[in-house]
Amino acid sequence: GLAVDSTDLPVCRAYIERLESQGGKYISSSKWNNTVLMQVPDEAIALRFLDNSFVRSIKKVWVSPDSIMPRNKDRKEQVKNQWKKQDDYYGMGAEQIKIHHGDSLHLAGFKGKGIQIAVIDAGFYNVDAMKIFKNTTILGTHDFVNPSSDIYGEHNHGMKVLSCMAVNTPHVMVGTAPEASYWLLRSEDNDTEQPVEEDNWAAAVEFADSVGVDIVNTSLGYYSFDDPIDNYTYRQLDGHTSLMAASASYAAKKGLLVVCSAGNSGMDEWKKITPPADAEDILTIGAIDNMGVNAAFSSIGNTADGRIKPDVMAMGVHSAVVGVDGGTAFANGTSFASPIFCGLVACLWQACPWLTVRQLIQVVHEASDRNAYPDNIYGYGVTDMWKAYQLAMKLKADTDGK
């Protein structure tokens, strides 16, 4: 077990009640970062919060949008649940698993059973209506953007991300961790791009920790916001400046493995990874094609403090996903490279539950094809997951022998 420290204590309830008495509406808090999210009708009330001795600073993170896109009330009618069977057991998902020898882990009986994965994303459109998810174990859902919304009526991005790991329909599509259990958490508001989404993410990852999650996949990243004053600079990619990176770094200290997409800014002026991909002791995943060549759009490292990023690469070009109609489709993005790899790491952790987060990351690095010469494009390269398993077994034998 891990020692309890001050970051395990909730934000003082008396402080929250004081802010409420001054006109604030409580939304959420982060015990790890010692922050609280309050909604106020005007800025003057927020400024009065500074009169309290327990308030160090305030920051505007959300402005109510002028309009919100209407949700599709007839969403389930979009689902056709039609697909073609393939000869290969993995169906459309074969290439993205076999490029890492993930099928060897599966053949050895390690398909993620007993591992809990939280997917923190933008919505899980129609997952509840798609037969292709019928063999997927979903433990629960929570919406940190709008707790009263229908998480299955929100954006389809999280559904596609989930499918890379969780689908278990042989000869149609089998994901990388078909026997793991999943929490579906929404932190991303697709209608706007505001810093509050970092607060939502911080609340979501702390919730994941509280319910016993082992691994978090997040195919989200932020550096540019609706108000340019909130934008990050490269110098801030230090693993601690952004709230999300700080929370992801804390998660690692609490024993959670965070697997994160590198970002799709490789061809933009920004080019770099996006927070929380700069966090410490997490796995940041870039995108390759089925030949192992990096995707031009895949964001590059390193972090501002010189750590190698991305960590490793997975298929993010022509990745097999579930489409909005419930059939299989292909998509591009580090958003899909991340869950593909996340599922494989879940299988590895099932096989080697004695590994710490840092040891997991270590064997992943050592089992990758550029381990001897990592760079800021490929990181440590493409991981052989069977080799990672063998290295983990050797590590245990060496440790037990001492």
Question: Model features per residue range: what roles?
Answer:
Residues 1-22:
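Aromatic- and Gly/Pro-rich amphipathic surface segment
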Residues 16-97, 102-106, 280:
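Autoinhibitory propeptides
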Residues 28, 35-39, 59, 116-121, ...:
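Structural recognition of the beta-strand scaffold that forms the well-ordered cores
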Residues 33-34, 43-45, 64-66, 122-126, ...:
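Solvent-exposed loop/turn segments at secondary-structure junctions
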Residues 103-142, 147-197, 211-214, 227, ...:
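Subtilisin-like serine protease catalytic core
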Residues 106, 168-171, 184-278, 291, ...:
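Substrate-binding/access-modulating region of protease and related hydrolase catalytic domains
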Residues 131-141, 290-335, 372:
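Catalytic-core environment of secreted peptidases
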Residues 162, 185-189, 272, 316-378, ...:
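Hydrolase catalytic cores
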